[in-house]
Regions:
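Short alpha-helical "patches" and their helix-cap loops
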Residues: 71-84, 105-111, 159-173
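Active-site histidine-anchored catalytic micro-motif
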Residues: 1, 82, 89-91, 100-110, ...
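Active-site/ligand-binding loops adjacent to catalytic centers
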Residues: 2-51, 56, 112-181
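Domain-scale recognition of functional cores that engage charged ligands
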Residues: 19-20, 32, 36-97, 101
Length: 181
């Protein structure tokens, strides 16, 4: 049981770990070696769509619970407040809203690594800043992978524009979106 699972430690923060994982996913020689051994590489965090799907469901389920408990009427809009680092959980609520869940406002709670808060306020995403170790390590992220998925939707599903922002983030450590996004 669990003989094909390994745990390893890294020196660094979440961003360092996630960068390494993404590199493994995109390294052809690793994919070839895994295929030779009839194996797949997977991630259990929110860079994997399989993690977001049940989160979408629990927003819908929570809304139904509020209706069934008489806290709100069917059709009433709710506010969603999520402590956010990699942007996956709150993105799931956004996808639920695209499916018809009536949401009034999305609130991204942050810690001192407030790259998302600054981005939402200014339209500038800048990872070139100090990283702070806090008591909320899952929020200790300077590169929020799931924000790319939101930007794709907000850009009208424009993969070229989205890719441009992500390339700028990779090469310069920052990008800026236009006011219409």
């Amino acid at each position: 049981e669990g003989e094909n699972v390994r745990v390893c430690a890294i020196k660094g923060n979440f961003d360092d770990a996630q960068t390494g994982v993404k590199k493994i996913f995109t390294t052809p020689s690793v994919a070839e070696k895994l295929a030779e051994n009839n194996m797949l590489f997977s991630s259990a965090n929110s860079i994997n769509w399989g993690r977001l799907l049940p989160q979408i469901v629990y927003y819908i389920s929570a809304y139904c619970d509020l209706v069934n408990d008489g806290k709100i009427e069917l059709g009433d809009k709710i506010n969603v407040v999520v402590p956010t680092g990699n942007f996956g959980n709150i993105l799931a609520s956004y996808y639920a809203s695209l499916m018809g869940l009536p949401i009034n406002k999305f609130v991204c709670a942050s810690n001192s690594n407030n790259v998302l808060t600054d981005f939402i306020k200014t339209g500038v995403y800048d990872k070139n800043r100090n990283f702070y170790t806090t008591i909320s390590p899952s929020m200790g992220i300077l590169v929020s992978s799931n924000l790319e998925r939101l930007l794709y939707k907000l850009s009208g599903d424009n993969d070229e524009v989205t890719r441009g922002w992500m390339n700028a983030l990779k090469s310069e450590g920052k990008y800026e979106v236009s006011d219409d996004v």
